[in-house]
Amino acid sequence: MKDILLITPPFTQLNTPYPATAYLKGFLNTKNISSFQIDLGIEVIIELFSKEQFTKVFAHAEQKNTILTDNSKRIFALKESYLNTLDAVIAFLQGNNATFARQICTDGFLPQASRFQQLDDLHWAFGEMGLHDKAKHLATLYLEDLSDFIVECVDANFGFSRYAERLGRSANSFDEIYDSLHKELTYIDQITLALLHEKIAKLQPKLVCFSVPFPGNLYSAFRCAQYIKKNFPNIKIAMGGGFANTELRSVSDKRVFEFFDFITLDDGELPIELLINSFSNNMAKMPLFKRTFLLQNNKVVYSNNCNKPDYKQSEVGTPDYTDLYLNKYISVIEIANPMHSLWSDGRWNKLTMAHGCYWGKCTFCDISLDYIKIYEPIAATLLVDRMEELISKTGENGFHFVDEAAPPSLMKALALEIIKRKLIVTWWTNIRFEKNFTADLCFLLKASGCIAVSGGLEVASDRLLKLIDKGVTVTQVAQVTRNFTKANIMVHSYLMYGYPTQTEQETIDSLEMVRQLFQIGVLQSGFWHQFALT
């Protein structure tokens, strides 16, 4: 029996756990509150993409007579080839049987459908000897073909890193999600709920907490909560996470609380501690809540009657990945982009250098939210203590610092502490392209194990950067990216188009500016996002 069950609902990343539950478990350890965490997403994926389960997928599609497109007919015709190779491909992408890469790269070994029509120039992307990455790329296309079959023939909501995302994106109204929750279970629902039942029956938690980071996790969180309410009615259920923090700050539809007892906002440590303490005290007459929505007298109320401040970052403990199946995550290479591979290939321990953003002025960012406006850096010595603890527990020495924007002064202190302790680590993070990233600092960061940074060039126009209050100029960005590149640190830039008042000519000029930055070699990766007001 555990006090708390922490759940990440399907789906997030394939290659590494989303860090929220590990952060919370690390904190709960400091309070001697027993907890267990599960990443339902990776568990569903591993169950689904197996020879045994996919045999059922093919049979289900045939029985329902949904194999209608040329692509799905081709995949079904090749089903024996898929079933004979599926378990071996998954094992390879989990880091087992490295020699299988040579077989995967053999022409005609893997069955191929429409995804292979988009095949990059493999020699350009991987060279003569990049067999392992080439094999991962081919195996990824193979899985994407099977994913297409699921979407076309079995469950249209499926996606590797999201499920029923469209429903989550319409969160201004609960009607569509509510209606979907009263329809027949989908194929993925059935797998998800079977795994959930097994965990809850074994652990018997007092409180189940769903961390919902993205719209593509929302439906599954509600479906799981619905199942718990029906089958384990004595268990209390809470929701938090990035989606709640941004989209549910003014929730008022009481139907939401048919599924969840509580919705907590912003940092989750203190709100969860108060919830579990109130259960232990049999819900005292005046229970204390921190930034929590609940139903009282058939009305949605927001309760924030606890005066205790949130815990300092030095007090929340080291993230704890115990309970998660770290050896089951799948490393994939979807496209031949070096930065994209950091997001999807390999397992990273995740840490935060500083809570919030030290700049906190960009006009496109919701700087009213606590996780952005409350800036609190963590001492470099404590950060490296946590890194050493995670290395000893996970066996992995790769770190992704998931800051909004890591501060240069703290990055310098971190690098010096890593070098002082003679640690061999690999790390990367998000930054602002500001002038404090001198050539000397970049070489120091490289010496400590920094391999990549990502930051926002946004609209690549000085007028618009000033309007955004980004605090940088295009010239400054070019100089800083040059400093990183000279130190052999890869640079990825987030780019934006369609910003209010941006003219057609400014858009063309920004494209040309980015092209030149790539041409001179100071940017190695970039991604354009269309500006959207939410």
Predicted region positions:
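Conserved SAM/AdoMet-binding glycine-rich loop
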Residues: 5-11, 207, 234-238, 246, ...
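Glycine-rich beta-alpha loop elements in corrinoid/cobalamin-binding modules
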Residues: 11-14, 19-53, 82-131, 138-142, ...
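Conserved, mostly hydrophobic/aromatic
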Residues: 28, 357, 383, 455
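Flexible glycine/acidic-rich beta-alpha junction loops that bind and position SAM and/or redox cofactors
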Residues: 37-49, 244-253, 411, 463-468, ...
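N-terminal [4Fe-4S]-dependent radical SAM core
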Residues: 177, 188, 299-350
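Short helix-capping segments at alpha-helix termini
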Residues: 229-235, 284, 419-424, 518-522
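Catalytic cores of alpha/beta
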Residues: 251-252, 441-442, 501-516
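Canonical Radical SAM [4Fe-4S] cluster-binding loop centered on the CxxxCxxC motif
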Residues: 343-381
